[in-house]
Amino acid sequence: MERGVRQLLADKISGNMIGLWLLIPEHLRLGTWDLLCGWSRQPGERVGPRLALQLIHESALCSAGLRNQRSLSQRGFELANGLPFVANDVAIHSLLAEHTVAESRRLQIALGQIRRTSGDFAGKLLAIDPHRTRSYSKRQMRRYRDDQKARPYKVAPTFFALDADTHQPVCFTIATSAQTATRAAIDLLEQAAEILASPAGKTLVLADVEHLAVELFSHVQLHTPFDLLVPMRNERWLQKQLRAIPSEQFTRRWAGFATMKRPYKMTSYAAGPFFQFVQRTGERPDAHYFGAFLSTTDRDEVNALTLDYPKRWHVEEFFNAHQALGWNRAGTMNLNIRYGQMTMALIAQAALHRTRRLLGEPYSGWDADHFAKSLLAGLEGDIRVHDDTIVVTYYNAPNADHLRQHYEGLPDHLQNEHIDPHIPWLYGFKLDFRFR
């Protein structure tokens, strides 16, 4: 492999996937290589970590489909992975199949802990949400229906936990379609607790009505450091109950909005108590509309309902913007393979987030597909070697002055951050950039 990589560098490369090399400094800052060596159980000289790096870069490029039907080679892609070739589907499939869900989960936890110490998570609000991707598998499986009028269909569910303040994913879990949202949420919160290491009462978990279950509330209250806030189903019995609350028990907050809170006992759960937050909208009694939320702890209901809970929708925004990284397709039903592939996409998202943050506007506002097409696979350039340094030159880079500020003289920038500028998967070469 090393001989092939050195030969490619000696021959020089021209292509339009040179933008992918902008991620390499972020891999060094993130410690991606050590994570991949640990996950693959192989030393850096072996091919396994490099195949995993190919998966990460495929995710960053939002590349999907059979590898033999793509044209990723001879454009600078394989060299960014430390390989003289683009690995085929069989090699990638074999790599993922060798590693279990537990190993990929440990990789997620290690990545999350690095991101936490780097300040990517505020750790105050955690939004959890299930995403069910339609599956066209011929396997027999439980079907899902989100609308009583629609026909049930096969799904491959993914459950995300997102920091609602920084809009960054903390972790995810997957399951078969038979898994309940409650059981999946318990697994997800156990994973998030290990990543965030939050003191008791610091983190509020925001969930949708699908997670209103005694089992989940019991688990959160007894076995996690988190608090939980979930809306109650807006059914007739609840509306009747809320309308029976005397008006003087509500506190008017501003025109058309009043709140109250009270202890709440679940009939099938002896511990507790929980707390019901009630909001009333409308000025006239005949126009009043009521809504209720259930919380595991007593807290300021106004902030919880008006400031905290609306941030749960950031998880929907995140998924819409970044699902093209590899979370919008069901693929195989082999959970080892799916979990591994989607975890590599999580690493890709972490590197992309850091790159966006460094570049600023307009790049920071682009979704994953736009960023991949316009920057990672949209910059023309060449790759050559000068002494012990790989020099990447861009000829059409937008905002070249801004990019030059962050990327030219990269080895010195990294050393100033106390990061070794030698790239282990590129056999100890350093990396520098030029903008023409």
Task: Place the predicted regions along the sequence by residue.
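Domain-level cores of phosphate- or acyl-group-handling catalytic modules
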Residues: 179-240
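Dynamic "connector" segments at or just before major functional cores
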Residues: 1-150, 160-178, 186-198, 222-223, ...
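Short, conserved catalytic/metal-binding motifs centered on acidic residues
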Residues: 55, 68-70, 88, 92, ...
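Conserved nucleotidyltransferase catalytic core and NTase-mimicking acidic/glycine-rich helix/loop elements
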Residues: 352-384
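Short, solvent-exposed helix-loop connector elements
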Residues: 39-43, 300-308, 324-339, 356-367
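Short acidic (Asp/Glu) and glycine-rich catalytic loops that position anionic groups and cofactors
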Residues: 2, 34-35, 71-75, 199, ...
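Flexible loop/turn segments at secondary-structure boundaries
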Residues: 76, 134-136, 179-180, 211-215, ...
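An anionic, glycine-rich sequence signature occurring as long contiguous blocks
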Residues: 222-323, 412-436
